[in-house]
A protein has these predicted regions:
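Post-Walker A helix-loop "phosphate-sensing" segment adjacent to the P-loop in P-loop NTPases
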Residues: 66-78, 89
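Structural recognition of the conserved hydrophobic beta-strand(s) that form the central parallel beta-sheet
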Residues: 134-137, 152, 163-170
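Charged, glycine-rich active-site and insertion segments that engage polyanionic ligands
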Residues: 2-66, 88, 123, 161-163, ...
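Conserved alpha-helical scaffold flanking the Walker A/P-loop in AAA+ ATPase domains
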Residues: 34-39, 110-133, 139-143, 147-150, ...
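A short hydrophobic beta-strand->loop->alpha-helix junction that borders the nucleotide-binding pocket
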Residues: 50-51, 99-104
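Short cysteine clusters
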Residues: 80-86
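Iron-sulfur (Fe-S) cluster-binding segments and ferredoxin-like electron-carrier domains
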Residues: 87-98
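Short metal-coordination and nucleic-acid-contact micro-motifs, chiefly zinc-binding Cys/His arrays
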Residues: 45, 76-79, 132
Length: 369
């Protein structure tokens, strides 16, 4: 599934200024917008935007950069959307915006890139705007390795007044303490359903697709947009449910053949598949506790999920969901793919089918290798 970089919010052609680069385009609370404005005008310390994948870091960083580069910014709304700087940024690039990210064929930013693109250009005056902005990706543990972070320390500490830094990360604790101490961190939390709905409305998707994306988004705008724009998402979800709903009646051989084959075929969608499986289990747990089906993530599958609940009275969806989360963590730590997925499928079969499960086999409260 494509990552979330920047989904431009389109304004109606009313003759009004283009607000797609302003803080207005960010679906968030007023308090959060005040934080962003403060980081632009009042506190010019290097900014560290921390938020999980899909939280909108790139989108927000671009609006912050636009405000810093703008010739006529508004102190509460950010970029004007009309000046030469804003018009250049709307084309997709800008002479005074330096974006540092891993090359397409690599997962890490080479330390040479940090030295040449940051330290090597630090003293060059801006060409169009009053400032120059460096947006640096340090998303994953290996995106900006220790040597690259060390090369960034002096520029963060000593730079001309026209230079501003924005660093993006999913986990600030993975960064060197010296990077964190030189930065001001803003944490990007999950959005409310209304805020996600506003973002989805601007994609022009049909209500059914947008509704499903909203329920699966879990407060993450990037997740919602990726799902709403992926024509295969509903098909993948339905194929996953066919496998999931058959697990209680399946054999061990089924799990190790057809079940494992499905996960190998869809390996690129693993993160999404695990979220989908967890959503099925969440819904089953709600039904098991007598909750209103209208509150299900997969509300369109309510009848099928209800049938599963009735057929396996001894099912333990809570323990099954813990196994799915544990599997995600193990795979993120590079556990063997086939072994880990097979173990999960066998465990789900047992937990969802109400079969006896030896405690020593599936210790869902502990990690495994």
């Amino acid at each position: 599934m494509p990552g979330f970089k920047d989904q431009a919010h389109q304004e109606e052609n009313t003759g009004q200024p283009d607000r797609s680069l302003s803080f207005h385009a960010i679906a968030c609370s007023g308090e959060f917008k005040e934080q962003l404005a403060h980081s632009v005008w009042e506190d010019k310390t290097p900014l560290l935007l921390a938020g999980e994948e899909g939280s909108g870091k790139h989108f927000i960083a671009r609006r912050l950069a636009a405000a810093i580069l703008c010739h006529q910014p508004d102190r509460s709304e950010g970029a004007c959307g009309q000046c030469a700087s804003c018009r250049m940024l709307q084309t997709g690039s800008h002479l005074d915006l330096v974006e540092i990210a891993p090359p397409d064929d690599k997962s890490s930013i080479p330390v040479a890139s940090v030295r040449s693109q940051v330290a090597g250009t630090l003293q060059i005056y801006p060409q169009l705007s009053p400032n120059r902005v460096y947006v640096i990706e340090a998303l994953k543990a290996d995106t900006l390795k220790e040597q690259g972070q060390n090369a960034l320390l002096k520029p963060l500490e000593e730079h001309p007044g026209f230079v501003r830094f924005i660093i993006l990360t999913e986990d600030a604790d993975r960064l060197l303490s010296t990077i964190r101490s030189r930065s001001r961190m803003i944490r990007i939390g999950r959005r409310s359903p209304d805020q996600i709905r506003r973002i989805l409305e601007e994609t022009g998707r049909d209500d059914q697709t947008a509704g499903l994306a909203l329920r699966y988004a879990d407060g993450l705008p990037g997740q919602a947009l990726a799902m709403a724009q992926d024509a295969n998402f509903r098909l993948l979800r339905d194929k996953a449910f066919t496998l999931f709903s058959g697990l209680p009646r399946s054999t061990r051989t089924d799990c190790l053949t057809a079940g494992l084959a499905f996960f190998k075929e869809e390996r690129k969608e693993l993160t999404l598949l695990l979220r989908v499986f967890e959503s099925f289990l969440r819904d089953l747990l709600l039904l098991q506790n007598g909750m209103d089906p209208a509150g299900l993530v997969n509300v369109d599958l309510a009848d099928d999920l209800g049938g599963m609940r009735r057929q396996a009275a001894g099912a333990d969806p809570a323990r099954a969901a813990e196994l799915v989360r544990q599997t995600a963590g193990a795979l993120a730590s590079n556990a063997n793919y086939d072994h880990t997925v097979a173990r999960m499928l066998l465990g789900l079969r047992a937990f969802m089918g109400g079969h006896p499960v030896p405690e020593q086999v599936f210790r869902t409260k502990e990690s495994f290798h």
